[in-house]
Amino acid sequence: MDVTCPFVLKIHRIVEKESRAGAHIVIIGDPDHPEVVGICGWCMGPYTVIRTEQDALDFVFPIDKNICIVSQTTFNYNKFKDLVEIFLKKSYDSTVLKTICNATEERQTEARAIARKVDAMFVVGGRHSSNTQKLYEICKEECKNTYFIETLVDLESKPFQSFGRVGITAGASTPNKIIEEVQKMSEMSFEQMLDESFKTIRNG
């Protein structure tokens, strides 16, 4: 049974078809990520993996040849658009296919919106999870007090008591139980902070 994500399977079919037709495949993503490694394996011809702006700027290809641009499903959507813009400015004969997972894009958009409104942001999930790392990067761009929370121990070591409003987001594979525990602990700690403040006032 093939349990590969349907979004990833779609990319496999795209790069196989386009590369058989003679296109040079450009994959925007992390070259070491298993998903990207798998996509490369479906390319029937030459391909290039692009992760950074410098990678895109350094890319050189004949103007009269076709390139097909796809992306890792969990890649930062805004960065994807920026990198594609670099290719378009080079006037290549480009076919651009947005292959970022819809749920990933929505989660990133929501996380960015929350991070803009809070004093601190907690990103809950595994440090080795690609989509969680992207969420952290996005939130950090909008809120300097952004923290990676993998376990409750990480939360205990963060100075969140000094922040008025705290936002929480989580990677797609993060268990709901962990998210709920982080939320509960944050709320409890905030209440404890208020209690201590009232004690200080009463004791003058």
Predicted regions and their residues:
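The feature marks the mature, well-folded catalytic cores of soluble enzymes
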Residues: M1-G204
